[in-house]
């Protein structure tokens, strides 16, 4: 009997040592491996957009909506595919919607519909992720190009609709539009959750004066002219997308492999494998609180892994570093520069 009690006590001690306690040095909670060529210091404030890996191979130009964050730091996204920006609510969660929209085509004077075939700007315009209060990252099931927001708890949430820039019309009636898809920024609500829509919006087609409708084979979004972010100091800038930030947009900084949001909370993988922002220090039981980087492809990575999973939770997706259930899809978290515009 005494032997059994000793085994139980040993198991409890081992379990407690495997998780973070508030008094521990949380900055040492790093994965054992690092991403080859990853950047652990980035000089500019940036956001993230959820990019389903299934679409990455087919088109690097198509971006998912940026993630939002609610107050508790969680990251979430909706299931409809929209171009809505991802927001962050108060808890730090990240959330985003899932609806996809196309950019409008422009028309010139002759009535033709036209769209450009190349984007002149070096950076793609994407919507930023918002954050709610709890720091969690979440996304809605509709696919929109809306920016990801963050709510109060730090969770990250985003909708699933992808939105594209509207197409313009020139004097001859032709419709013209650019060729890159712009994603909405992820927002953050009070709890730190990250949210973003998943609907993809296509930009409207433009029309020139002759009435012809023209458009290129690639869907593009309007590039926002703005000053370039400050250059990074340890290599080529891997971030190729940018967006205008707005209230609730998840704003992140990366320094020495430590990821923080606009409120100074620590980006971490918590005990249930969810990505959210807390603290400092991170919440008890956190698995990783350091070891973040931006890959040469412009994706957020933890350790040597740049694949995350958006898993359906009610009307939103939460973001995890592991596949935890049947309603989970592999995604990349694309870094996007945030602009004041």
Swiss-Prot record:
Localization, UniProt: Secreted, Cell wall
Alphabetical keyword list: Cell wall, Cell wall biogenesis/degradation, Cleavage on pair of basic residues, Glycoprotein, Repeat, Secreted, Signal
Keyword Glycoprotein attributed: yes
Segment forming the signal sequence: 1-18
Gene Ontology cellular-component annotations: cellular bud scar; extracellular region; fungal-type cell wall; nuclear periphery
Gene Ontology biological-process entries: fungal-type cell wall organization; intracellular protein transport
Predominant location: secreted
Source species, domain of life: Eukaryota
Record's comment on post-translational modification: Covalently linked to beta-1,3-glucan of the inner cell wall layer via an alkali-sensitive ester linkage between the gamma-carboxyl group of glutamic acids, arising from specific glutamines within the PIR1/2/3 repeats, and hydroxyl groups of glucoses of beta-1,3-glucan chains.
Induction: Positively regulated by signaling through MPK1 in response to cell wall perturbation. Expression is also regulated by the SWI5 transcription factor.
Site description Covalent attachment to cell wall glycan, residues in chain: 74, 93, 112, 136, 155, 174, 193, 212
Any one Pfam family match given in the protein's UniProt record, by short name: PIR
Keyword Repeat tagged: yes
UniProt GO MF annotations: structural constituent of cell wall
Residues of the site described as Cleavage: 63-64
InterPro entries with a match to the protein in the record: PIR1-like_C (IPR054508), Yeast_CWMannoprotein_PIR (IPR051153), Yeast_PIR_rpt (IPR000420)
Family per record: Belongs to the PIR protein family.
Stated role: Component of the outer cell wall layer. Required for stability of the cell wall and for optimal growth. Required for resistance against several antifungal and cell wall-perturbing agents and for tolerance to heat shock.
Domain notes: The PIR1/2/3 repeats are required for covalent linkage to the cell wall. Their number varies among different strains of S.cerevisiae.
Protein name as it appears in the record: Cell wall mannoprotein PIR1
Organism of origin: Saccharomyces cerevisiae (strain ATCC 204508 / S288c) (Baker's yeast)
Lineage: Eukaryota, Fungi, Dikarya, Ascomycota, Saccharomycotina
Protein encoded by which gene: PIR1
